[in-house]
Amino acid sequence: MDFEKIREEKIRFFEDHHTIVIATSHDNKVTARTVSYATEGLDFYILSWEHHEKIQQIKGNPNVALARDNISIKGVAQILGKPTDEKNKRGAEAIKKKRPKEFEMFSRIPGMIMVKVTPTYIKSWVRVDNRFFIEHLDLEKRQAYLQKPDE
């Protein structure tokens, strides 16, 4: 499989959507919730209040999972800080482009922070010639391959 082609397909898919489920965990407690996001390439940018449970869990364990439709993602979250800080300009621009009203409304609220999720692995169900496969996109190894569901 062509790694870059599959990667570009995923980029386009996530550009066309606005919400995703993020699962976070710490001290053997896992929680999940739907969040709004924007992407730059395959990096996801999310706004949240710093006191929210997901942020506290990310502080203790940056490994997260994202899910949308038939796609699941393993990734690493990084708390960037205030969305209006100069150092967060890339993420802020991505959110402004995709969700300008949301950025304007939430970015200046005290306690609002930006989180960046960098995917490491993407797995999805795909159909090829009327047969279902699990498509793997290993972003760390830069590999893409199909797997039969019964393997």
Model feature map: region roles:
Residues 1-11, 48-55, 59:
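Short N-terminal signal/transit or membrane-insertion segments
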Residues 1-19, 140-151:
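Extreme N-terminal tail/first-helix region
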Residues 15-21, 96-100:
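Short Pro/Gly-enriched beta-strand edge/turn motifs at strand-loop
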Residues 15, 59, 66-68, 107-110, ...:
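A generic structural signal for short, non-catalytic loop/turn and secondary-structure boundary residues
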Residues 17-50, 55-58, 64-68, 76-78:
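Short beta-strand segments
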